Design a protein with these regions (language model features):
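Extended hydrophobic alpha-helices typical of membrane-associated regions
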Residues: 785-787
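Glycoside hydrolase catalytic-domain context in secreted enzymes
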Residues: 17, 39-755, 766-780, 789
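Bacterial Sec-dependent N-terminal signal peptides
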Residues: 1-46
Length: 791
């Protein structure tokens, strides 16, 4: 062709040179315009209101919400397991488990690539079972690829320290912490745990477990604060405050108040079984700890596995909306437990399929789903079908986004390895773990003052038992830690008494598969020793999930020692050599033979990474034991209802062929010194129903050692419109006393400590006579008593 012809609105024909010049100018202008648009888009993204850290959180939430698609909104209600957990379990499971098992988080039909894509598409809000900083950062990088760059919440079961992660501090479990009656310590441990979690780029702990544990068969007693509503309430509230701080720094994490409600009081003592309980018992026993933690600012609440009076907790509108939000003013978000919404289909049979179960749960008040592959698609469909309004979805998403802004995750989605290494397992935290362990160990028996040991007298000591030299001492919700980070009982003994010859006979770690030959060997060695230490109890380590005898989903039909442990104790004790039994367990055990025949018994619960040192310090008198039982120790499973705060008629008819009294009562614990309570008096003997009074008692350390006594105040309403407990804990204090020292201790008796739900289910203080009791345990014989008249 000789020329190019262009015609524009009748204009003249231009030459090739003119046209080429025109095209170059046009392309250049277009490129400048495109660059300008791109820069403007980047600039506008950078200056979006929701990304402005100076803007009020409420405005940031609304701005972000307005930009989200329905798919992205539902994604904010979606939690999945971490990629490494997913990959590891998928590879290790059998074909049958892959097809049927939900507990190990295998998602049939999904791959790691699918999870990564969902995350980078903004369809995942949170992950759990992420155990390393590297994976947490990698998941956040995926989230930052999403359109709106909404950061993830990383959740973990940091029940007693962030113990599922390597090199993090492992404190005593909650049942031991409760036995210290040390509320400030609970707060401190939670603060330190929060710091270690944030150093691992984790933001949400599934704790405190504020269920009141009344049944020792239930495997999760160890993660609770015991059987008393008042003690559980104070420990749970302090723990909640400790985790959260002000929820505005990189030292704060979200608490998760769980499990709401009734899981600790199932009909057969098994996890997830039905709970059938009156509203009166709910409000008097099980609700107070939840209410206090919620009103302390608890940011999240987890529902309980079970059905409550026929209605699954995960679809229970009365619990989620009426009680939590309307009565208690809960502003945070509610999360399901491990695929428990789906269990409405295959366990409770209250929904025909998962989609229907999701509908029921969301309409009842659920905000976030833990965990499972079907949630995203099904919930989006429910909205598009008009069965759930978008505004209902917005309610949940607002609550979830609010916490992410509070925690500063939009500004700080990553954490460096340098910051992690500076914080985790630091000297201050390790010192706290050791001190907490010392204060959590209960001395149950000490005939003829066998303890503390005189190292010059007992030069050759046999140490044996499944818990003598095993990391199981850390307790449930722990993963294996480097050996140099954990002090077992054997290590602790050798550390504290290096001049003693300790001979160790290993019984293995598994109580169900103990060797008769090893028991025989230990008995033979016991005959040659000056003294014997037997470390028994239960096995709790989660990496051997199917081998545990205590912990989550590890419930029992009896409370006896498992396997050959009783034989080991009996035969060693029968050698005639002084014998000490050390129990390491997450639940109260029925050690009847030992209680009658073994001269010294220590109940160490699950004392954490320095438990062995703390036990050894008590054995050799470096530390004077002070802990008191946070849970009654029954004689058998038939005595599970012998909690101290029973109703008066509970034992009107005594049992035959046995005893009505427990092995050791709530609040019980010995010391190497003795204490005397005297002169219990009230600041007024008569008060009005809206008035307060003070109860004062004198406590004297009558022994020759310094010590700490846990003074306890109980109250009974003598005559009331409804049947009331024989006593209820309403005050306690840790009292440090030098040998020979006396101190006056004062307890406040306020109207709320006298109030109860009357015959009309109204909380009130009824006029009449109250009995005030103060002493060193809940046992009547240990209590001083006086009367208070309320007009």
């Amino acid at each position: 062709m000789g020329s190019l012809v262009a015609e524009t609105n009748g204009s003249e024909i231009k030459s090739n040179k003119t046209i080429n010049h025109y095209m170059k100018k046009t392309i250049a202008t277009a490129l400048i315009t495109l660059t300008s648009i791109t820069m403007t888009a980047k600039d506008s993204t950078k200056h979006l209101l929701y990304k402005d850290p100076k803007a009020p959180i409420e405005q940031r939430v609304e701005d972000l919400l307005s930009r989200m698609t329905i798919e992205e909104k539902v994604g904010q209600m979606n939690q999945l397991v971490g990629i490494e957990h997913f990959r590891e379990n998928s590879q290790s499971m059998t074909a049958e488990e892959l097809a049927t098992n939900t507990a190990n988080a295998f998602y049939p039909g999904m791959t790691v690539k699918d999870i990564e894509k969902m995350t980078s598409d903004g369809l995942v809000s949170s992950f759990l079972h992420v155990l390393t900083l590297e994976e947490a950062n990698q998941l956040q990088k995926l989230a930052m690829k999403s359109r709106l760059q909404i950061p993830l919440l990383i959740g973990i079961d940091a029940i007693h320290g962030n113990a599922k992660c390597q090199n993090n501090t492992v404190y005593p479990t909650n049942i031991g912490l409760a036995s210290s009656f040390d509320v400030p310590m609970a707060y401190t441990i939670a603060r330190q745990t929060a710091a270690e979690m944030r150093a691992m780029n984790m933001h949400w702990t599934f704790n405190p477990n504020v269920e009141v544990a009344r049944d020792g068969r239930w495997g999760r007693c160890g993660e609770t604060f015991g059987e008393d509503p008042y003690l559980v309430t104070l420990m749970g509230e302090a723990t909640t405050r400790g985790y959260q701080g002000n929820l505005n720094t990189t030292q704060d994490v979200l608490a998760c108040v769980k499990h709401f409600v009734g899981g600790s009081y199932s009909v057969n003592g098994t996890n997830g079984a039905p709970c059938d309980v009156s509203e009166r018992t709910l409000r008097e026993v099980f609700f107070p700890s939840f209410e206090a933690s919620v009103k302390a600012g608890g940011a999240t609440v987890m529902m309980s596995h079970n059905e409550l009076n026929g209605i699954p907790c995960h679809t229970n509108q009365w619990l989620m909306e009426d009680v939590l939000r309307k009565e208690w003013g809960f502003k945070g978000f509610i999360v399901s437990d491990w695929m428990d919404i789906e269990h409405c289909v295959d366990q409770h049979f209250t929904a025909a399929n998962n989609k229907e179960a999701f509908l029921q749960s969301i309409l009842a008040g659920m905000d976030m789903h833990m965990h499972g592959p079907e949630w995203q698609k099904a919930v989006v469909e429910l909205v598009k079908e008009g069965k759930i309004t978008e505004e209902r979805i917005n309610e949940s998403v607002r609550r979830i986004l609010y916490t992410k802004f509070q925690l500063g995750l939009f500004e700080h989605p990553y954490v460096t390895a340098k910051e992690r290494d500076r914080v985790i397992n630091n000297p201050e935290h390790k010192a706290t773990a050791l001190e907490a362990a010392r204060n959590s160990i209960v001395l149950l028996k000490n005939d003829n003052a066998l303890l503390p040991l005189d190292a010059t007298k007992y030069k050759k000591v046999l140490v044996t038992g499944i818990n003598a030299d095993d990391q199981n001492i850390m307790g449930d919700w722990s993963e294996v830690q480097p050996d140099d980070k954990v002090t077992t009982v054997l290590k602790g003994l050798r550390q504290i008494s290096p001049e003693t010859e300790f001979e160790f006979v290993d019984q293995g770690w598994d109580p169900r598969n103990m060797s008769q030959a090893k028991v025989d060997e230990a008995v033979a060695k016991a005959k040659e020793a000056d003294l014997n230490i037997v470390c028994c109890g239960e096995y709790m380590m989660r990496f051997r999930w199917n081998d545990r005898t205590s912990g989550e989903d590890t419930d029992r039909d009896n409370l006896d020692l498992v396997g050959l442990q009783n034989q080991l104790i009996e035969r060693i004790n029968e050698t005639g050599k002084p014998t000490i039994l050390i129990i390491i367990s997450g639940r109260p055990l029925s050690v009847n033979y030992a209680a009658e025949h073994v001269p010294a018994i220590i109940n160490a619960w699950e004392p954490g990474q320095y438990g062995g040192q703390a036990i050894a310090e008590i054995v050799y008198g470096k530390v004077n034991p002070s802990a008191k039982l946070a849970m009654t120790m029954p004689r058998s499973a038939g005595q599970i209802s012998t909690w101290y705060n029973h109703k008066a008629s509970a034992f009107f008819h005594p049992v035959v062929c046995g005893k009505s009294t427990p092995l050791y009562p709530f609040g019980y614990g010995l010391s190497y010194t003795t204490y005397k309570y005297s002169d219990l008096r009230l600041s007024a003997n008569n008060i009005g129903k809206d008035e307060s009074v003070k109860a004062t008692v004198t406590i004297t350390n009558t022994g020759n050692r310094d010590g700490v006594e846990i003074a306890q105040m109980y109250i009974r309403d003598c005559v009331s419109s409804v049947a009331r407990p024989v006593k209820e804990l309403k005050g306690f204090e840790r009292v440090a006393l030098k040998a020979g020292e006396s101190r006056d201790i004062t307890f406040d008796i306020t109207p709320d400590r006298l109030a109860f739900y009357d015959i009309h289910m109204q909380k009130t203080v009824e006029p009449g006579e109250f009995e005030v009791m103060v002493g060193g345990s809940s046992e009547d014989a240990q209590l001083l008593k006086t009367k208070l008249e309320v007009k």
